[in-house]
Amino acid sequence: MTRVVLAAAYRTPIGVFGGAFKDVPAYDLGATLIEHIIKETGLNPSEIDEVIIGNVLQAGQGQNPARIAAMKGGLPETVPAFTVNKVCGSGLKSIQLAYQSIVTGENDIVLAGGMENMSQSPMLVNNSRFGFKMGHQSMVDSMVYDGLTDVFNQYHMGITAENLVEQYGISREEQDTFAVNSQQKAVRAQQNGEFDSEIVPVSIPQRKGEPILVTKDEGVRENVSVEKLSRLRPAFKKDGTVTAGNASGINDGAAMMLVMSEDKAKELNIEPLAVLDGFGSHGVDPSIMGIAPVGAVEKALKRSKKELSDIDVFELNEAFAAQSLAVDRELKLPPEKVNVKGGAIALGHPIGASGARVLVTLLHQLNDEVETGLTSLCIGGGQAIAAVVSKYK
């Protein structure tokens, strides 16, 4: 079978809600990375067979945001593109679709990843197309409804985390401690420049003066403590334990990579970073969607012909501390190998981009000692996706 390799992998910094990227459309963040990958690899843009990009909150951006990103990123109009929505798994699903298209011989080179600007998601006035006869009407927050609400139970994703708290007996202190650890690891990695190789700075024009260059993730917080987090009120349930401090944020960002057949990489003298070994997807009861990575990880390992003990590093999306703790309990993961640079609680969770972001961060950790990695994300609606990669040899 054709070996599929990852030949370049980058991401933007992750902006906080209403932060540095609030006026930068998702497709511009994606275009920045496409342009950078073409320049970095020296690849002829016309040799790219397809562009596949995850993007969840598409309303108001225009037709097919992936196509917009591709064209604005400098690709010729002959290169097709399409947009993927698998909620939080969109970015990783895009990479899986690229992988599948190469294995089947349809493509040789694909740009794949994810992008999201949650700050720019619009408010909607449903059923207003043909007017209202009388009475008050309300607006729907497209970010909350299309991105963060379990449509089957009509409640926020945070309630699914509270359901896992009850099922697994997870305490508030455990969640806050997990969140503090995530922040501390991210602070350390940021201060040591460990994200520098994976981040492409984004220049933001200003009405007056020089452009602002965004180089670092905005959500990383120093001086976070369990004591400080314990003062926060429950965010989703009156007597709950899930708070803004032990959950991922609302964020903006993008991540992208060059997916190729090994033969094409050799032909073009492009040195790959890693080999895609296999993927797994799984579904569970939507009310406990956060536990779905367990099944996805098991399937990805089986398809990759690997055991959990073969994995040197894990990048698992931290939708909620409670969700992450539940998955850890089921899989019995070695904590020293999981999210060693911090996770989404600290770095952020731009939903359409996160699937690609966790893989980008994982790829930049591979070396002679860390040869195999696994990444996974839970997905609203009761799903999860996972992937296994190995350092290219």
Swiss-Prot record:
It comes from the Bacteria. It comes from Staphylococcus aureus (strain MSSA476). Pfam families: Thiolase_C, Thiolase_N. This is Probable acetyl-CoA acyltransferase. It is found in: Cytoplasm. Its EC number is 2.3.1.9. One of its GO terms (cellular component) is cytoplasm. The keyword Acyltransferase applies. Belongs to the thiolase-like superfamily. Thiolase family. It is an enzyme of class 2 (transferase). InterPro entries: Thiolase, Thiolase-like, Thiolase_acyl_enz_int_AS, Thiolase_AS, Thiolase_C, Thiolase_CS, Thiolase_N. GO terms for molecular function: acetyl-CoA C-acetyltransferase activity.
